[in-house]
């Protein structure tokens, strides 16, 4: 609805509009949270991959150290490689699941947007609306 239509809406209609907008914002926030988690998981997976690339050619009995929480723990290369491979495999699975969730959340967001006829304003439209409201003029519907 335009600002003119919103001003003429009943309090019940305004409350319904507010709820629709809040739900849209919540869905968008959830989508952004999932995307951030995907990014974090992918970075962690790449980091494990880089470590694996570095140590795979070392002697199996060579010492290496791994930081677990705040403790540096001594291992041998042969003990760490399977753990790294397992971590990479698990992170790949989690990443795929999160990507699937991201796609589903995007579909849910688009459905909500279409169902409630939500249109995002461009920067220019937003500036014009703010300017018109500041001047006390209502924009064209």
Curated annotation (Swiss-Prot):
PANTHER family: PREFOLDIN SUBUNIT 2 (PTHR13303). This is Prefoldin subunit 2. Belongs to the prefoldin subunit beta family. GO terms for cellular component: cytoplasm; endoplasmic reticulum; prefoldin complex; sarcomere; striated muscle dense body. It comes from the Eukaryota. Keywords: Chaperone. GO terms for biological process: protein folding. Heterohexamer of two PFD-alpha type and four PFD-beta type subunits. SUPFAM superfamilies: Prefoldin. Binds specifically to cytosolic chaperonin (c-CPN) and transfers target proteins to it. Binds to nascent polypeptide chain and promotes folding in an environment in which there are many competing pathways for nonnative proteins. It comes from Caenorhabditis elegans. Transmembrane segments: none annotated. One of its GO terms (molecular function) is protein folding chaperone. InterPro entries: PFD2, PFD_beta-like, Prefoldin.
């Amino acid at each position: 609805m335009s600002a003119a239509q919103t001003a003429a809406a009943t309090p019940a209609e305004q409350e319904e509009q507010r709820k629709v907008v809040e739900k849209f914002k919540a869905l968008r926030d959830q989508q952004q949270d999932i995307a951030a988690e995907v990014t974090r998981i992918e970075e962690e997976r790449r980091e494990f991959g880089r470590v694996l690339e570095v140590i795979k050619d070392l002697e199996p009995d060579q010492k290496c150290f791994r930081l677990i929480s705040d403790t540096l723990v001594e291992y041998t290369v042969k003990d760490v490689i399977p753990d790294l491979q397992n971590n990479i495999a698990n992170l790949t699975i989690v990443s795929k699941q999160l990507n699937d969730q991201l796609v589903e959340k995007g579909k849910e967001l688009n459905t909500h947007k279409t169902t409630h006829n939500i249109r995002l304003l461009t920067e220019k439209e937003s500036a014009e609306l703010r300017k018109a409201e500041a001047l006390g003029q209502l924009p064209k519907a």
